[in-house]
Amino acid sequence: GKYKKPVYVHCSETKREVEECREKTGMTPIAYMDSLGLFENGGGLFHGVHLDEADFDIMKKKKICVVTNPASNLKLASGIAPVKTYLEKGIPVAIGTDGPASNNCLDMFKEMFLVTGLQKVVHNDPEAVPAADVLKMATVNGAYAMGLDNCDILAEGKYADLIMIDLMQDRKSVV
């Protein structure tokens, strides 16, 4: 398009959404949006739970990232995002909370725990998504998903938002 900006969209969150799009267009939501040229300048998907192989190929080719929202997807019974598959295919994954209407707790530590825990159960593999990958999803990849390119490391001249974590709190002691 004339604006040459990335497009970000809630997409492929529920099976029903994907089925209805296939019925109306003959394509998945990702394929349909791609056919309209919406991903010519990159962008991202929020949720990305129900995809087929062609969807992954489009995302990889068009440099589309995904923001997974595990607590929201659990609350709304949307499904579990294929995070391990995204990582294996080299598609950047960030972690989000979706919002208070679909997630009762906007706690990123909870989201991080859910990302890794759900993938372990789905793949029956305690190392399905390593902790280092989850930390990257919650930090650097979040910045990437928002189009921020000057906050990937702690260094002079780079931007940074920092938090302090009380390691004496029981729930944070595993940090």
Where are these regions (language model features)?
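Histidine/acidic residue-rich metal-binding segments in metalloenzymes
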Residues: G1-C65, A77-V93
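Nucleotide-sugar donor-binding loop of glycosyltransferases
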Residues: C11, P70, D166-M168
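Short, acidic/turn-prone active-site loops that include or flank metal/cofactor-
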Residues: E13, P70-L74, G99-A101
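His/Asp/Glu-enriched, well-ordered alpha-helical/loop segment
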Residues: S35-G42, K84-M168
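Residue-level marker of alpha-helix boundaries and capping positions
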Residues: F46, N73-L74, P130
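Short beta->alpha connector loops
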Residues: G48-D52, S72, L148-D149
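Short, charged, surface-exposed secondary-structure boundary motifs
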Residues: K75-I80, N104-L106
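Conserved small/polar residues in nucleotide/adenosyl-binding loops
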Residues: K172-V174
